[in-house]
Amino acid sequence: EAPQNKGIDMNRCWQVGENYTRYTSDRNYNGEKGFQAYEAKALRDFLIKNKSQNGQTILVDLHGWTQQLIGDVKICSYYEKQFPENNKSGVGRYGTGYLVNWARTYLGSSAGAAKSALIELPKAGVTDHQSVVDKKFSNRYITATLDMLKSIK
């Protein structure tokens, strides 16, 4: 759906409210309107359909490789323990056009607002699949996620 067959950055096309912030650079092009990326539209519809109606909705968005923690302070604290090398300046912030910002706005329930965080994996020393295995990213991520889930009451 993008003009000139341009790809859409699905990480920045999550519209909150009536206004839409456009990014036009080749790296971050996010379309002319929210959810123009069909994958984002499908994921949005799935999340809305499956959100908690009366419990706590928690969303953790994982990608690489900008080595950051962004979003809910408590959620990020679990990942900070496993990824101490990550930049923490985005903790408590949610980004414009990000899934985690949209999620905290639209996935709440009668029990309260949704909690969300974006975990960007570290990039230092990552050159191939084996380096990701050697750095134990999967084990570290799973440990942080299980610790977070165990804390939910």
Task: Mark where each language-model region is.
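Active-site/substrate-binding loop(s) of hydrolase catalytic cores
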Residues: 1-93, 118-122
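Active-site-adjacent mobile loop/cap segments within catalytic or ligand-binding domains
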Residues: 59, 69-71, 77-81, 95-153
